[in-house]
């Protein structure tokens, strides 16, 4: 009888695991934001910083991401932007917010003659405010919309 129950429950277990498993390895939007944009410990001062970081953060897999910005501030400072004055995002959505102060950032721009797999980036450092799109509960950055 115990074996019969186990055999009856097995298909149900397979169904549940099939539904749950794909989401286990999926990167959340907030985690992707951190991977692509946060480097609290870095300074971005090396001319090869962007080449190294874009590769390390998996933004040169299959193609070269044309533009990316790294923020060199504590994550809490970036999260704080989500409680600032609301601004319209570039895509017209209303979930963007501008940081209250300028932050240390590094812009990485793909050089014109650069082609995959040899992605070559120009590294530029700035002190600028950032505009981030925020979502979720807790309300956290999920997209870096601009630096101004």
UniProtKB/Swiss-Prot annotation:
One of its GO terms (cellular component) is extracellular region. InterPro entries: RNaseA, RNaseA-like_dom_sf, RNaseA_AS, RNaseA_domain. Disulfide bonds join 50-108, 64-119, 82-134, 89-96. Keywords: Disulfide bond, Endonuclease, Hydrolase, Lyase, Nuclease, Secreted, Signal. The active site is at 37 (proton acceptor), 143 (proton donor). Substrate binds at residues 32, 35, 65-69, 90, 109. It is found in: Secreted. SUPFAM superfamilies: RNase A-like (SSF54076). GO terms for biological process: defense response to Gram-positive bacterium. GO terms for molecular function: lyase activity; nucleic acid binding; ribonuclease A activity. PROSITE patterns: RNASE_PANCREATIC (PS00127). The keyword Nuclease applies. The keyword Lyase applies. It comes from the Eukaryota. Coiled coil: none annotated. Its EC number is 4.6.1.18. SMART domains: RNAse_Pc (SM00092). Pancreas. Gene3D superfamilies: Ribonuclease A-like domain. It catalyses: an [RNA] containing cytidine + H2O = an [RNA]-3'-cytidine-3'-phosphate + a 5'-hydroxy-ribonucleotide-3'-[RNA]; an [RNA] containing uridine + H2O = an [RNA]-3'-uridine-3'-phosphate + a 5'-hydroxy-ribonucleotide-3'-[RNA]. Endonuclease that catalyzes the cleavage of RNA on the 3' side of pyrimidine nucleotides. Acts on single-stranded and double-stranded RNA. Belongs to the pancreatic ribonuclease family. Monomer. Interacts with and forms tight 1:1 complexes with RNH1. Dimerization of two such complexes may occur. Interaction with RNH1 inhibits this protein. This is Ribonuclease pancreatic. It comes from Gerbilliscus gambianus.
